Amino acid sequence: MRVFRLFDSIRNIAFFEPPRYHAPMRAFKHPIPSDVTLERLLYALSDPVRLEIVRCLAGVEEASCGELDGGRPKSTMSHHFRVLRDAGLVHTRNVGTTHMNSLRAEDLDQRFPGLLHSILAQA
């Protein structure tokens, strides 16, 4: 939070907080199922943190980034979610100021039948 000082004279200092304005969040870009490649998918799942995120999402319909962060820094988790989105594993949508994530299991099963289930069974 930034606080600004106004000087109306040398002895009088007034502090004020500027009005808060939150612009609407941009929608995330997700690859179409036919653009999902096996290389990107396997790369995204090669990191233990991302694999744990996918494992958690497999057990629920949807979860926020905060529910999945495991106490890790926000910037680190933002990177992991971007890699998962770019690989086509996760769909992220905005709900107010929260990002809700869901596993794109149906899309992945159409593109690579049984792959996600096999990976999660072994993890």
What residue spans do the PLM features occupy?
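Amphipathic alpha-helical dimerization/coiled-coil segments
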Residues: R2-T37, R55, G59, R104-A123
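Helix-centric, low-specificity signal for extended rod-like, repetitive segments
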Residues: F4, I13, Y43, P48, ...
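Intrinsically disordered, low-complexity regions enriched for glutamine and histidine
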Residues: R20, M77-S78, T97
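Compositionally biased, intrinsically disordered low-complexity segments enriched
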Residues: P24, F81-R82, N101
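Short hydrophobic/aromatic-rich motifs at helix boundaries and adjacent loops
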Residues: M25-R26, V36-T37, E52-I53, T76-H79, ...
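N-terminal helix-turn-helix DNA-binding core of bacterial DNA-binding proteins
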Residues: E39-P73, V95, H99-D107
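Canonical helix-turn-helix DNA-binding module
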Residues: G66-T92
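A general structural signal for short secondary-structure boundary/capping elements
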Residues: A87-H91, H99-L103, H117
